[in-house]
Amino acid sequence: MQKVGISAIVTAYERVDQTLKTLRILESCDPKPDEILVHVDGNGIECVDAIARTYPQVRVLVSNDRVGPGGGRNKLLAAASHEFVASFDDDSYPIDSDYFARVLQLFDRFQDTSIISASLYHAGEAISLDEREARWTADFSGGACVFRRAAFIAAGGYVPLPVAYGMEESDLALRLHAQGGKILSSSWLRVFHDTDLKRHAEPQVTAGSIANLALLAYLRYPVSLWSIGILQCANRVLWLLRHGRHRGIWRGLTMIPGHLRAHRHFRLTVSNRAVRSYLALRRAPAHASL
């Protein structure tokens, strides 16, 4: 079997059958990753046992308390044996069987890349052709990307949050950007996310998405740019109202003070210039020549 020098990591929480499906697809890739590691959140013993029975070669890490997908990925990347670490959710997996060979080609072509983000498709969405195109972007999807392990560790990893919407990837991407790291997004890498995203309408997700935007601004923006964070929170609330996601809005707003206090030890701001250039790249990604 061809060795590719890639670790694959999966963050799992409660969805046992979907976790096993993701592992089956990873194992069927050609070439497949050199190792697969799974983090099981919230002491999910049923999931741990199912993996041990079906895929005994997979390394399993367990957290007794909920640390969220970001906290799980922190542990997985610390334990990974290889420099390139392909990251998936328990319900996301490669569409193309040669996914990992393509990953190596992209890292070889773009050797200054910190993260490569795949095109992510959800249930019910049309899947586009795997065109050999790429661009430099501000953001990435944690369940459909490949990390350069050294860059991830140098940036400090994720802030562990049980409900991380609106915070975890943006926060890490901003810190990477401030350090000169680069994120490449490519349509040549395709990942399927086996969900219809209905859970995004749950009240706790709505609340978390508001409070996390405030947390991002508090942890990373200089005080002179806190007005941008306030505007981002306001825009999020307006978007939620327009889309009928009313439940959780008030909770999200009222939890902000406590949310900031609870995570104040993570505060490490980046420069005014870094925030502005990051937001500019988010608005206008740059073409990368393949």
Give a label for each model feature.
Residues 85:
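Short aromatic/hydrophobic "clamp" motif used to bind/position activated sugar donors
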Residues 208, 223-290:
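Non-catalytic, C-terminal membrane-associated alpha-helical segments of glycosyltransferases
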Residues 24-33:
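Short, acidic, metal-binding catalytic loop of nucleotide-sugar glycosyltransferases
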Residues 63-80:
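Glycine-rich, basic loop-to-helix element that forms the pyrophosphate-binding segment
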Residues 40-48, 92-93:
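A conserved acidic beta->alpha catalytic loop
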Residues 33-43, 61-63:
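Short beta-strand/loop segment that forms part of the nucleotide-sugar
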Residues 93-130:
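Conserved donor NDP-sugar-binding/catalytic core segment of glycosyltransferases
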Residues 145, 151-156, 162-190:
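A short, conserved alpha-helix in the catalytic core of glycosyltransferases
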